[in-house]
Amino acid sequence: MVDIKKEQERDELHRAIWAIADELRGAVDGWDFKNYVLGTMFYRYISENLCNYINSGKIDAGNTDFAKMRDEDAEEAREGLVEEKGFFILPSELFCNVRANAANDENLNETLERVFRHIEESAKGSEAERDFAGLFDDYDVNSNKLGSTVAKRNEKLVKLLNGVGEMNLGDVKDHSIDAFGDAYEYLMTMYASNAGKSGGEFFPPADMSELLTCLGTVGKTEINKVYDEIVA
């Protein structure tokens, strides 16, 4: 049953990625496309991760849904959240809220650029600073590849946000697959040939990784150390 669920989730994710690729066809080449999809997926993930963390009561940010809080009120929890999570996102800059306003935001490119800058800056001084530094550098919201005018670029960005927003990623803990890892592998496989590369240059095949994991854990109930000799 687990394998069936895994394949269903993987197929659904692949269809969603292909739908976004179809929407952006002729605008962004495959090698750049992966940066936009993965960057948007990560933006959604950390937004939802932060909201879930706060709304579950793991930090006191008031008795309300964090996504619906005023930025001014949320600021009171910034220091504690950066210490706990390594980053901070204002409610107005969460993925769900930016996406909700995207179609009517004539300056969506500037909005996303500002949001990404704020996320990276929020991690400064924390243990996660190096992880967030330059995180969205390859996500060029002003690239002519998205369109010849700001309006056309924003139109593509709206489609990108909606495409990722409609992905059924659910709760990470409830999924049998690593959505981000699987999306990365799928994107590499889709577009590596266009860049004169092979997907295997960037990741070991999933089947090989799963086989080695099974062989290495046969008869074991606990794992103390892991050595990956084919890690990329």
Locate the predicted segments by residue.
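Conserved class I S-adenosyl-L-methionine
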Residues: 221-230
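Short, compositionally biased segments
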Residues: 209, 231-232
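Non-catalytic, mostly N-terminal accessory regions of nucleic-acid modification and defense proteins
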Residues: 1-221
